[in-house]
């Protein structure tokens, strides 16, 4: 019984926390879908395609692939040519 009450309280708390910390819980999904549709029509509009501060091929990256524009890192950034 205590476990059931604790589970219900935890679910209610997490649900409330999600709505409180959301940017716009009232119109969040309404504004999300038109933007996604616009980005599908124009893939250049996507912010995910832009990589700022990344290293080009041949520069030292250690073991962190996030530093390379190509996302391939083996001590140096690797760029594949098609």
Curated annotation (Swiss-Prot):
Record keywords: Calcium channel impairing toxin, Cleavage on pair of basic residues, Disulfide bond, Ion channel impairing toxin, Knottin, Neurotoxin, Presynaptic neurotoxin, Secreted, Signal, Toxin, Voltage-gated calcium channel impairing toxin
Entry comment describing in which tissues the protein is expressed: Expressed by the venom duct.
InterPro entries (UniProt xref): Conotoxin, Conotoxin_d-typ_CS, Conotoxin_omega-typ_CS
Keyword Disulfide bond: yes
Removed propeptide positions: 23-51
Signal peptide limits: 1-22
GO cellular component assignments: extracellular region; host cell presynaptic membrane
Disulfide bonds: 54-69, 61-73, 68-77
Cellular compartment(s): Secreted
GO molecular function: calcium channel regulator activity; sodium channel inhibitor activity; toxin activity
One Pfam family in the UniProt entry: Conotoxin
Domain notes: The presence of a 'disulfide through disulfide knot' structurally defines this protein as a knottin.
Physiological role: Omega-conotoxins act at presynaptic membranes, they bind and block voltage-gated calcium channels (Cav).
Family: Belongs to the conotoxin O1 superfamily.
Protein name listed in UniProt: Omega-conotoxin-like 9
Organism: Conus striatus
Upper classification of the organism: Eukaryota, Metazoa, Spiralia, Lophotrochozoa, Mollusca
